[in-house]
């Protein structure tokens, strides 16, 4: 069974957390889902410094920082909006503020306002391309990177409110 089917079948946040923590790219990057809210509205991801995710200058690989935040808004919104919606990651940018070392953390949340904006923007079948900022923090709470995630969201044809 493919990863997408497994994600869709994950009936609880606990099961999705377990699945994602055994996902090969996450294992290889040293990324771990630390917390997923039971209502799918918050995810906390951590990455500890390891020999296998350290670059030539002794800091975290930039790609590993991005992989920490990559699928989470998409996955949360897939669960929150249900099968009536198409949700894809469309684009992203990341700004590296300072070298990341030690344990890094990113928290992503979906608010009532975000869900309301999605439902309103897609009610007539239009695509919606929201942008969600994400910060990655070090152990002292300093921002090491800022990312901007753009999603593609559309209500599936033939679905009425």
Residue ranges and their predicted role:
Residues 76-113:
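Hydrophobic beta-strand-centered segment that forms part of the acyl-chain substrate-binding groove
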Residues 52-72:
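Hot-dog-fold acyl-thioester-processing enzymes
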Residues 29-33, 90-96, 117-119:
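Short structured motifs
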Residues 1-44:
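Non-catalytic linker/capping segments at the edges of enzyme domains
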Residues 32, 93-95, 107-109, 135, ...:
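Residues located in well-ordered beta-strands
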Residues 29, 41-43, 88-92, 102-106, ...:
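A generic structural signal for short beta-strands and their flanking turns/coil linkers
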Residues 49:
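Short, charge-patterned binding micro-sites
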